[in-house]
Swiss-Prot record:
Listed transmembrane segments: 588-608
Name of the featured protein: Toll-like receptor 2
GO cellular component: Golgi apparatus; membrane raft; phagocytic vesicle membrane; plasma membrane; receptor complex
Species the sequence originates in: Macaca fascicularis (Crab-eating macaque)
Post-translational modification: Ubiquitinated at Lys-754 by PPP1R11, leading to its degradation. Deubiquitinated by USP2.
Family (UniProt): Belongs to the Toll-like receptor family.
Keywords: Cytoplasmic vesicle, Disulfide bond, Glycoprotein, Immunity, Inflammatory response, Innate immunity, Isopeptide bond, Leucine-rich repeat, Membrane, NAD, Receptor, Repeat, Signal, Transmembrane, Transmembrane helix, Ubl conjugation
Boundaries of every LRRCT domain copy: 525-579
SMART domains in the cross-refs: LRR_BAC (SM00364), LRR_TYP (SM00369), LRRCT (SM00082), TIR (SM00255)
InterPro entries: Cys-rich_flank_reg_C, Leu-rich_rpt, Leu-rich_rpt_typical-subtyp, LRR_dom_sf, TIR_dom, Toll-like_receptor, Toll_tir_struct_dom_sf
Length: 784
């Protein structure tokens, strides 16, 4: 029994491990390049079923806690390994021994409390290493990175437990492109710990307090090019003289990000910055200034000149005492050498005129996302303000009048580039005044509905994208670049108005087509971006775009952004891929051919109708149908006559003097219908013929040469012919008054010809002895 339980337990463990491994494999996706992604897949361990071809493995945000020596042994070609945010607390000494080609290793935000140099010794190709967010106190007992000669980006430290930096920590590192140290809770710094790194392009230092800042700063002045201080409270910072022994500093840019500072501490910071002889750029991002702008220090000293600083950038500066802020007059002496200033999203509504006049070297000014209006801008751009200014950016402020804005800036004699996008202008006046050297104007996203002569003729670059324009007809002889995307234009601008145009970006309008002739009219055009329009994929447009191979060099967004909007069956397809049928592309020729074929068919039908009397058939059919549709006086047809006699007027003597006498005077008498005697006066002849035939028991045709030539006799034959078809009877009696060939009867009277071919007809004998027999036979035929 115990043996059985043991076997069941072993099998359960094996099955559980098998299921776990199967689940691990299902959470991974690998492409043909050997890049495997298993992020957020609830993995508990590193999958073992992958091949040696794997080059990149992303296992971030899983539940891996342990890495053994064998987990990564087979991945000898691995170049990138991401294990961030797992919960790893243990890595065996030789876990990375087979990863000699690894270049990117991310172990950030796990639970590694102790770091081992043996992990990194085999990683001779490593260029990127991230150890941020692990709860270690120091960077190990021995130097971790001394063997990583190719390392270029290093990130170490954490917010809570990393308290000590030692001299050995960075031994062996000579050059880094980026070094990030999260020393938020740093309590101990061994002098010259960072001095061993000879060159760092960009150093990011997280420090909550400034206590050790000066000591670290001393070691960085000769090795760091760009120094960034993050998340630091400098409210109580006080500068003390440094004994660096350095006359030259490599620091060219100093960035303060998410830093708290006061008027007094800013004065102390300026003292610190004055020690950096090569400082050129100063940046404040997301900082808080707890002051009113009085930077003279507690002893009312003059603000220290920061030296050679040429660029100052301030973004999202928060000033709690904004409405008590001073006029910045204490900063005036420091501004004369500054060439570039950016103050973005910091609630600036005015630059004092005196400050503007002191900015004598200023060439670039960016006041985006602030509160500037025309009235205060006029004060800022007062006479002699910003004398060297070439570029002014007032994007997303509160400007409302284009005419006033241009007039306000007339004092800026050297202004060439102006960005006033994302203001709300709506209306553009017919004329405006602008600085005479204007070359670039950005009016994008200003809600204008039309463009007028307000646009300066001197422009070389114009951006009016994302507005409500449906027409562009300005003559700008010097314009080289036009950005007019996201409007409502239906066609390309007139090339004759833009003779120097090199770049045209007109995507996402309502353009349906453009032609080779239109593009050729832009003689200097090098770049065209016209994707995202509602193209009608006509045969001409497709032929032009698909056959012009040189077009791909001009259309920078070809072919991905050129999609058909119509015809409907190709909507959404790329213009490059659409092929239309011959019938769609040669519709005019096809219609012409069909018309010709129809004409020939009609002509052929006409010839056939004429040859076989088709017109006559149609006329008779119509007349007969009309006659049959007439309302009858009685529901049943009344037979009034024994026979209707159809004869030629030239045979009237024989009919009236012989036939009538023999039949109507016979006992019992026959009642004959003769057109001379019995037709109703005033009634249509054709109606009389039809009614007489219908009211007669028989129809007697007195055939002769005269009968065949008579037009009215033909009508009587016609309607008798239709009666034969309609009633399917033998109501016709043929009397040959004189010999006549059957061929003399027209072909169209096929039924009568058939009767003559199949039944005996009566022939008037010239011999008087036989005439009595003729009358007997005729009476018998009428009675039948």
């Amino acid at each position: 029994m115990p043996h059985t339980l043991w076997m069941v337990w072993v099998l359960g463990v094996i099955i559980s491990l098998s299921k776990e491994e199967s689940s691990n494999q299902a959470s991974l996706s690998c492409d043909h390049n050997g890049i495997c992604k298993g992020s957020s897949g609830s993995l508990n361990s590193i999958p073992s079923g992958l091949t040696e071809a794997v080059k990149s493995l992303d296992l971030s945000n899983n539940r891996i806690t342990y890495i053994s020596n064998s987990d990564l042994q087979r991945y000898v070609n691995l170049q990138a390994l991401v294990l961030t945010s797992n919960g790893i607390n243990t890595i065996e000494e030789d876990s990375f021994s087979s990863l000699g080609r690894l270049e990117h290793l991310d172990l950030s935000y796990n639970y590694l409390s102790n770091l081992s140099s043996s992990w990194f010794k085999p990683l001779s190709s490593l260029k990127f290493l991230n150890l941020l967010g692990n709860p270690y106190k120091t960077l190990g007992e021995t130097s971790l990175f001394s063997h990583l000669t190719k390392l270029r980006i290093l990130r170490v430290g954490n917010m809570d437990t990393f308290t000590k930096i030692q001299r050995k920590d960075f031994a062996g590192l000579t050059f880094l492109e980026e070094l990030e140290i999260d020393a938020s809770d740093l309590q101990s710094y061994e002098p010259k710990s960072l001095k061993s790194i000879q060159n760092v392009s960009h150093l990011i230092l997280h420090m909550k307090q400034h206590i050790l800042l000066l000591e670290i700063f001393v070691d960085l002045t000769s090795s760091v090019e760009c120094l960034e201080l993050r998340d630091t409270d400098l409210d109580t910072f006080h500068f003390s003289e440094l004994s660096t022994g350095e006359t030259n500093s490599l620091i060219k840019k100093f960035t303060f990000r998410n830093v708290k500072i006061t008027d007094e501490s800013l004065f102390q910071v300026m003292k610190l910055l004055s020690q950096i002889s090569g400082l050129l750029e100063l940046e404040f991002d997301d900082c808080t200034l707890n002051g009113v702008g009085d930077f003279r220090g507690s002893d009312n000293d003059r603000v220290i000149d920061p030296g050679k600083v040429e660029t100052v950038t301030i973004r999202r500066l928060h000033i709690p005492q904004f409405y008590s802020f001073n006029d910045l007059s204490t900063l005036y002496p420091l501004t004369e050498r500054v060439k570039r200033i950016t103050v973005e999203n910091s609630k600036v509504f005015l630059v004092p005129c005196l400050l503007s006049r002191h900015l004598k070297s200023l060439e670039y000014l960016d006041l985006s996302e602030n509160l500037m209006v025309e009235e205060y801008l006029k004060n800022s751009a007062c006479e002699d303000a910003w004398p060297s200014l070439q570029t002014l950016i007032l994007r997303q402020n509160h400007l409302a009048s284009l005419g006033k804005t241009g007039e306000t800036l007339l004092t800026l004699k050297n202004l060439t580039n102006l960005d006033i996008s994302k203001n709300t202008f709506h209306y553009m006046p017919e004329t405006c005044q602008w600085p005479e050297k204007m070359k670039y104007l950005n009016l994008s996203s200003t809600r204008i509905h039309s463009v007028t002569g307000c646009i300066p003729k001197t422009l070389e670059i114009l951006d009016i994208s994302n507005n409500n324009l449906n027409l562009f007809s300005l003559n700008l002889p010097q314009l080289k670049e036009l950005y007019i995307s996201r409007n409502k234009l239906m066609t390309l601008p007139d090339a004759s108005l833009l003779p120097m145009l090199l770049v045209l970006k007109i995507s996402r309008n309502t353009i349906t087509t453009f032609s080779k002739e239109q593009l050729d009219s832009f003689h200097t055009l090098k770049t065209l971006e016209a994707g995202g329009n509602n193209f009608i994929c006509s045969c001409e447009f497709l032929s032009f775009t698909q056959e012009q191979q040189a077009l791909a060099k001009v259309l920078v967004d070809w072919p991905a952004n050129y999609l058909c909007d119509s015809p409907s069956h190709v909507r959404g397809q790329r213009v490059q891929d659409v092929r239309l049928s011959v019938s769609e592309c040669h519709r005019a020729a096809l219609v012409s051919g069909m018309c010709c074929a129809l004409f020939l068919l009609i002509l052929l039908m006409g010839v056939l109708c004429h040859r076989f009397h088709g017109l006559w058939y149609m006329k008779m059919m119509w007349a007969w149908l009309q006659a049959k549709r007439k309302p009858r006086k009685a529901p049943n047809r009344d037979i009034c006559y024994d026979a209707f006699v159809s004869y030629s007027e030239r045979d009237a003597y024989w009919v009236e003097n012989l036939m009538v006498q023999e039949l109507e005077n016979f006992n019992p008498p026959f009642k004959l219908c003769l057109h001379k005697r019995d037709f109703i006066p005033g009634k249509w002849i054709i109606d009389n013929i039809i009614d007489s035939i219908e009211k007669s028991h028989k129809t007697v045709f007195v055939l002769s040469e005269n009968f065949v030539k008579s037009e009215w006799c033909k009508y009587e034959l016609d309607f008798s012919h239709f009666r034969l078809f309609d009633e399917n009877n033998d109501a016709a009696i043929l009397v040959l008054l004189e010999p006549i060939e059957k061929k003399a009867i027209p072909q169209r009277f096929c039924k009568l010809r058939k009767i003559m071919n199949t039944k005996t007809y009566l022939e008037w004998p010239m011999d008087e002895a036989r005439q009595e027999g003729f009358w007997v036979n005729l009476r018998a035929a009428i009675k039948s």
